[in-house]
Amino acid sequence: MPKYRSATTTHGRNMAGARALWRATGMTDADFGKPIIAVVNSFTQFVPGHVHLRDLGKLVAEQIEAAGGVAKEFNTIAVDDGIAMGHGGMLYSLPSRELIADSVEYMVNAHCADAMVCISNCDKITPGMLMASLRLNIPVIFVSGGPMEAGKTKLSDQIIKLDLVDAMIQGADPKVSDSQSDQVERSACPTCGSCSGMFTANSMNCLTEALGLSQPGNGSLLATHADRKQLFLNAGKRIVELTKRYYEQDDESALPRNIASKAAFENAMTLDIAMGGSTNTVLHLLAAAQEAEIDFTMSDIDKLSRKVPQLCKVAPSTQKYHMEDVHRAGGVIGILGELDRAGLLNRDVKNVLGLTLPQTLEQYDIVVTQDDAVKNMFRAGPAGIRTTQAFSQDCRWDTLDDDRSNGCIRSLEHAYSKDGGLAVLYGNFAENGCIVKTAGVDDSILKFTGPAKVYESQDDAVEAILGGKVVAGDVVVIRYEGPKGGPGMQEMLYPTSFLKSMGLGKACALITDGRFSGGTSGLSIGHVSPEAASGGSIGLIEDGDLIAIDIPNRGIQLQVSDAELAARREAQEARGDKAWTPKNRERQVSFALRAYASLATSADKGAVRDKSKLGG
């Protein structure tokens, strides 16, 4: 029988000092035999996805106390990728994931907490907390802040849906008037919550649901809706049950590594491919799998991508549907239901509620459930009122979207595409693979060949695009922006958005060893591995080289002879300590970022730290 971790600090005469300090936090004699549960919050006023979380930690804590636990809350940092985008701030985004994971480990282990409730929401916060949870392997439940409502505005006598990406594209489009750009900007992000499309934040919150570590509805129920409050109340109660199951009944099925098993990781990736999730999810799932000591690699993702169809299409891949529409169609469980009927899921998995996949689908899949309360929950919709308050409205759709032929979520028979929404490509400058969000690629450019325009920073590429130096047919190559080379593996949302602004969204390709925002669409290929700074062949591409992209056949090829590449590699190595570094880039890199870069691996490894360098 495992011993409560917290007993280390609450029992025994030699822990009198620790108990004295616990008493100063409000604990009493009656509390010293109870499980201490960390409420890991991420409230900040910097991030719309987190601005409403201040009081939600208290809400969870009250339920933990009522159920017989002791709740202790702490906060992590949270970077807003959208605000950090397009300047030096983006260098800090991906490294913040490791910082969040480490800080959770530090707090939980330093104070010997027994379990956690993770209140996350946005891009690097959910992955960081997920990595920490699987590293620590103590009972955990995730409950995120929820998606933002889609923006809406009237243009050309028509009401259209909007999101952050629309504001960026229109702001850079010289053909758009100042007044229209301002109108879109003011309408794009109307409420608290994670940005309203299938961007990285919402993708990751959907994946924690598929992994079994959060409750049904977590990935899609709007931040503003009153129904979301129940997820927080349930999380506080349920974590005490899970904690007691493990420590008092020796039930290891309550632990996250036994819930988020390899089978669950495969299900999560299957969901990701089917819903056309952000390419960043690949990076984060690979990193989380390593923390769980699960053998889950790019090869597994490649195999899944070849057999899973696209069953859901959401912004930025279409403007018709946003997360509020996914929820109306049944949310994550709705997509999993269609995947299960297609025979594409591992059924022998359980979630934090203790339900198997078949049990979860029977109760929560709107196509089959007989539970009116569940159907009512999935009718939760937007109010269209600007707010930063959680649970501030209770509007509902008149009907559910259970049309699996023409609705937001489709059946296998009526799939948007036989091929899934993500694909892994391999070739002579991406020997370890690269990722493309096929859900956002127009059919006309699934095969594309063009001359390279090479840039050694995102800034130079943006200047060239907006300056008219990139023309139709070009393949923009941005290198030395990987985890080590950036450092920090910047997102390339500005270059891809500005290609659209310049009318080149379907006329050019963009390839990088950096990564893309979940808001990116178009022929945008990222995570090229190995990265240039690690000696990857993307560092050998020269202006004018032809690059052939073949998504249907999963290929990407630099049309240069092996002999020429060998000669270029020899010349690169001859640069000595300047080899595999940018030739003309002025960038101030802080000590903190240099420390991150010294241990960073390429994207095919999840951009995690190289343990071999630390002897571990």
Swiss-Prot record:
Pathway participation: Amino-acid biosynthesis; L-isoleucine biosynthesis; L-isoleucine from 2-oxobutanoate: step 3/4; Amino-acid biosynthesis; L-valine biosynthesis; L-valine from pyruvate: step 3/4
Which Gene3D superfamilies does its entry note? IlvD/EDD C-terminal domain-like
The keyword Amino-acid biosynthesis is assigned to this record: yes
User: Molecular function terms in GO for this entry?
Assistant: 2 iron, 2 sulfur cluster binding; dihydroxy-acid dehydratase activity; magnesium ion binding
Coiled-coil portions = none
| Gene Ontology CC | cytosol
Provide the binding site for [2Fe-2S] cluster. Answer: 122, 195
Gene Ontology biological process: isoleucine biosynthetic process; L-valine biosynthetic process
List the PROSITE patterns hit by this protein, alphabetically: ILVD_EDD_1 (PS00886), ILVD_EDD_2 (PS00887)
- Residue positions annotated to bind Mg(2+) are 81, 123-124, 491
UniProt keyword annotations, A-Z: 2Fe-2S, Amino-acid biosynthesis, Branched-chain amino acid biosynthesis, Iron, Iron-sulfur, Lyase, Magnesium, Metal-binding
**Per the entry, which co-factors are needed?**
[2Fe-2S] cluster; Mg(2+)
Q: What is its EC number?
A: 4.2.1.9
Keyword set includes Transmembrane helix:
no
List the catalysed reactions: (2R)-2,3-dihydroxy-3-methylbutanoate = 3-methyl-2-oxobutanoate + H2O; (2R,3R)-2,3-dihydroxy-3-methylpentanoate = (S)-3-methyl-2-oxopentanoate + H2O
Its assembly, as annotated, is: Homodimer.
Please state which protein family the record places this protein in.
Belongs to the IlvD/Edd family.
Q: What's this protein's function?
A: Functions in the biosynthesis of branched-chain amino acids. Catalyzes the dehydration of (2R,3R)-2,3-dihydroxy-3-methylpentanoate (2,3-dihydroxy-3-methylvalerate) into 2-oxo-3-methylpentanoate (2-oxo-3-methylvalerate) and of (2R)-2,3-dihydroxy-3-methylbutanoate (2,3-dihydroxyisovalerate) into 2-oxo-3-methylbutanoate (2-oxoisovalerate), the penultimate precursor to L-isoleucine and L-valine, respectively.
- By what name is this protein known? Dihydroxy-acid dehydratase
- Which organism does this record belong to? Escherichia fergusonii (strain ATCC 35469 / DSM 13698 / CCUG 18766 / IAM 14443 / JCM 21226 / LMG 7866 / NBRC 102419 / NCTC 12128 / CDC 0568-73)
The gene designation is ilvD
